[in-house]
Amino acid sequence: MRNEPQITPELVAAHGLKPDEYERILKLIGREPTFTELGIFSAMWNEHCSYKSSRIHLKGLPTKAPWVIQGPGENAGVIDIGDGQAVVFKMESHNHPSYIEPYQGATTGVGGILRDVFTMGARPIACLNALSFGAPEHPKTRHLVSGVVAGIGGYGNSFGVPTVGGQTRFHTRYDGNILVNAMAVGLADADKIFYAAASGVNMPIVYLGSKTGRDGIHGASMASAEFDDSSEEKRPTVQVGDPFAEKLLLEACLEIMAADCVIAIQDMGAAGLTCSAVEMGAKGDLGVDLDLDSVPTRETGMSAYEMMLSESQERMLMVLKPEKEKEAEAIFRKWGLDFAVVGYTTPSKRFVVKHGGDVMADLPIKELGDEAPLYDRPHVASPALPVIHAREVKAPMAIIPALEKLIATPDLCSKRWIWEQYDHVILGNTVQRPGGDAAVVRVQDGPKGLALTVDVTPRYCEADPFEGGKQAVAEAWRNITAVGGRPLAITDNLNFGNPERPEIMGQFVGCLKGISEACRALDFPVVSGNVSLYNETNGRAILPTPSIGGVGLLDDFTKSASIAFKTEGEAILLIGETHGWLGQSVYLRDVCGREEGAPPPVDLAAEKRIGDVVRGMIHAGTATAAHDLSDGGLLVALAEMAMASGIGARLLAAPASIVPHAYWFGEDQARYLVTVPETEAGRVLAKMRGANVPCTRIGTTGGTALAIAGEASVEVATLRTRFESWLPGYMGGAAA
């Protein structure tokens, strides 16, 4: 082999491999690895690709249901929505690159998740995102918000897919590690799904798409280590995206799939050519021989190490039917994309890489992929926090001033400044735009619609990982239900700190147990996902943030509900039990200055029972508007319904049994607001009593103000001005 760097303990450590892992490599291959082999092991055995700290716990997630076609383990999950149609979806993180280079980090995050979806044979129809930024007063936050939002919009808008929903939060725990979680949803024929497992010996392995450069080398390894003060120096490991090349790649891939050319397909994402080739071979129980002399490159003098670890974007690897090779090549040439046979499948179960006539790597393929190291790391449960009793919390201001303050806080204010930079209506199928409970996207050429949402409440997960995990799933389920959707499945993006710290691993394990329990109780299986660990800087971890992306089905998209009040004189009903739970509420944090206490418990049986009733009301046309209750509680939800319509409401006073500020701002779970015509109110209330569903009339729509009996009132227009002003003002340079 060629002269390569000497393998030293320092070089091994620089590749993110622990001494015991390197010893395992020596035992596995019976010799010292080459430099290229060391890079391959580093890429395949890092946390980002191998899931070595999380795999043992992920096995407990419920992943099956009659409508699940493909669960975790492929590029994306697939569910059956009837009529021969399937929805393909996944969520993935691009956290570390987005902190270092926010625009490019965000663009390539979107590009990567779109490829995961169309690799399965689906045409992307929607994107969503979940963004977590540091405290507004942190000197980098404005720059990061601006770059990430521009990157998401720049890629999605140019590629031609609508960005229809998401979630954005600010907290000081994300100062040194922001989170950029991107979700993509696509539509495919249920009987034409494409998979990654190669089959057949001596089948051509074809490189497709853009040329390989030096960008992104060790991007996956960077995503498997915590940051320190030198993180800015990692800028060269951030990939550069080209949405127009990705659009060409999409069309070319779908065309050769339709021409029945493809045996297996894998996008080149994390760890690039290494990961895609290893996964295809390992999943198919085959070996892979690659000749790097055939790889299209855009830079001269690239080494085998660089080509194997490059994360240049807009690239695919396929195993083609030999008799279809010329037809496939003609299709890709037509789209102006590179097409090169770079290797063949073999029966050897070995991964062999050649360059310039030399063998640069010769490794057992299964041990690189399926049989990477697996850890059951020590973990300790988070200590239980005390329940905060509402009567012990002094209200620092009256109810209406507190509402005005809350809707102008970073977490609860309008995110219009963000979503107006995204094209959310391209393709012409967006039924409900951002700003409601869930986006609704029409399934083209039919009456069906998809309800899409992304949810998590990190402060709950920090306070009680188990309840926080349950709540993240329950809120996604509620948001889909609140637009009239039938929740079908989720994708998760599990963002946590350093798993080598037992308390962080305890958060991960606790959240995962909560997610599993909620998914089982709500019949809401996990079909895809991503784990992002080491989200720490100088030992300070992010809040545990298990983002949940939910997908639901509407049989008739024209019957979806929205949050806006529809007309004056309708009854406002509060469905679900209200106790006035203030622990970990936004009110307690942002009005009272206390970030403490146990979060609200999640009663999954109540979630199911109450949600099914609300969905039935929407389908029957009884509910004219619907909104789930979450951050900010009852009065914030009422304000959102009023601001969405311009119609006010006359509200009854808080019941004597609940402290007023806890009634209006508590965050009890399993609750919805619905409006019904006055003529239906009595019948609905009686029906709810008969079904053992808590339901109370709390007011009537009408006027131009929110008016609470015995309290002050506030004009809806005044609320809207405050609601819409904070984020544009902040991004324009106003003090945080």
Swiss-Prot record:
Q: What is its EC number?
A: 6.3.5.3
Q: Which UniProt keywords apply?
A: ATP-binding, Cytoplasm, Ligase, Magnesium, Metal-binding, Nucleotide-binding, Purine biosynthesis
The pathway it acts in is: Purine metabolism; IMP biosynthesis via de novo pathway; 5-amino-1-(5-phospho-D-ribosyl)imidazole from N(2)-formyl-N(1)-(5-phospho-D-ribosyl)glycinamide: step 1/2
Q: Name one GO molecular function term.
A: ATP binding
Q: Which domain of life does this protein belong to?
A: Bacteria
Instruction: Give the location in the cell.
Output: Cytoplasm
Give the EC class as a word.
ligase
The entry sums up its family as follows: Belongs to the FGAMS family.
SUBUNIT field: Monomer. Part of the FGAM synthase complex composed of 1 PurL, 1 PurQ and 2 PurS subunits.
Function in brief: Part of the phosphoribosylformylglycinamidine synthase complex involved in the purines biosynthetic pathway. Catalyzes the ATP-dependent conversion of formylglycinamide ribonucleotide (FGAR) and glutamine to yield formylglycinamidine ribonucleotide (FGAM) and glutamate. The FGAM synthase complex is composed of three subunits. PurQ produces an ammonia molecule by converting glutamine to glutamate. PurL transfers the ammonia molecule to FGAR to form FGAM in an ATP-dependent manner.
Q: What PANTHER family has UniProt attached to this entry?
A: PHOSPHORIBOSYLFORMYLGLYCINAMIDINE SYNTHASE SUBUNIT PURL (PTHR43555:SF1)
What name has this protein been given in UniProt? Phosphoribosylformylglycinamidine synthase subunit PurL
What species does this protein belong to? Bradyrhizobium sp. (strain ORS 278)
Gene name per UniProt: purL
